[in-house]
Amino acid sequence: MEGRVNALSNINDLELHNFLVDPNFDQFINLIRGDHQTIDENPVLDFDLGPLQNSPCFIDENQFIPTPVDDLFDELPDLDSNVAESFRSFDGDSVRAGGEEDEEDYNDGDDSSATTTNNDGTRKTKTDRSRTLISERRRRGRMKDKLYALRSLVPNITKMDKASIVGDAVLYVQELQSQAKKLKSDIAGLEASLNSTGGYQEHAPDAQKTQPFRGINPPASKKIIQMDVIQVEEKGFYVRLVCNKGEGVAPSLYKSLESLTSFQVQNSNLSSPSPDTYLLTYTLDGTCFEQSLNLPNLKLWITGSLLNQGFEFIKSFT
């Protein structure tokens, strides 16, 4: 231990060993140059230290073994106490700190890889957003095309915005539905009137079918013996009809009168002046008639209504 202290004291004095004084200096030079002739099998082990054995630098046998750190700093007599404490604090914590720094560097590498993963996720999110925007643009384009087609079908468009186009289309559809309902009701009324008219007209063919069985010239079931039409006002007329009696004659007379819907019937009277005839008189007001009205035209209207009910005229009317 004393030899170690002497060695450290020599180190602290910063004194250099003068190898020029040593007798083995020439031998060192020869070894470096390679001029030695006889070399033993292990020249290092056979090397004669000589005076170097007593040198202060090679006192301890374990001089090449590293001295423990605690013993080294415990044997520092000339150092300041603060400096010695600082050396003593150098222990495994510093090593662990260094290891932790290395671990942090490694973790930084992991964080960078995680960042790369996050970047990939961000790229995927951006790609999804771009696809969503493209699909939304296509959907809006299709909607615009459909709105333009709808606008071309609707006749009355108030404004060119989307809400106005849809609202006008709804109103137009509702109007078409109301017109369809009205037309259906009109068609139903016409069918009912045609069915009723056709029922009465079927009697004439039946009568014609039965005529061969009655005889060659059977008497007609409905005959107009006389018809007089007189104009009493500008659009007022008086009508007088004489016909034979028979089954269903009186109802047919009134049905022919009801068929004159373009005129207003002011009064009517049905009487029987003789056992074989009926007398029907009535007055018509043609103020509601839109077309030009005169006496010949009125006679044609009345004649047509009677013919539709199956009447026959025996002689020309006046």
Curated annotation (Swiss-Prot):
Expressed in roots and inflorescence, and to a lower extent, in leaves and stems. In roots, confined to the outer cell layers, specifically in the differentiation zone. Also detected in the endodermis and inner tissues of the central cylinder. Its main location: nucleus. Residues 121-136 have a biased composition (Basic and acidic residues). GO terms for cellular component: nucleus. Keywords: DNA-binding, Nucleus, Transcription, Transcription regulation. Induction: In roots by iron deficiency. Repressed by cytokinins. Induced by cold, UV, ethylene (ACC), jasmonic acid (JA), flagellin, and salicylic acid (SA) treatments. Residues 127-176 form the bHLH domain. GO terms for molecular function: DNA binding; DNA-binding transcription factor activity; protein dimerization activity. Residues 90-138 are annotated as: Disordered. The keyword Ribosomal protein does not apply. It is found in: Nucleus. GO terms for biological process: regulation of DNA-templated transcription; regulation of iron ion transport; response to iron ion. Residues 100-111 have a biased composition (Acidic residues). Homodimer. PANTHER family: TRANSCRIPTION FACTOR FER-LIKE IRON DEFICIENCY-INDUCED TRANSCRIPTION FACTOR, TRANSCRIPTION FACTOR SCREAM2-RELATED. Transcription factor. Essential protein involved in iron uptake responses. Regulates FRO2 at the level of mRNA accumulation and IRT1 at the level of protein accumulation. Confers enhanced iron mobilization responses at low iron supply. This is Transcription factor FER-LIKE IRON DEFICIENCY-INDUCED TRANSCRIPTION FACTOR. It comes from Arabidopsis thaliana (Mouse-ear cress). The gene is FIT.
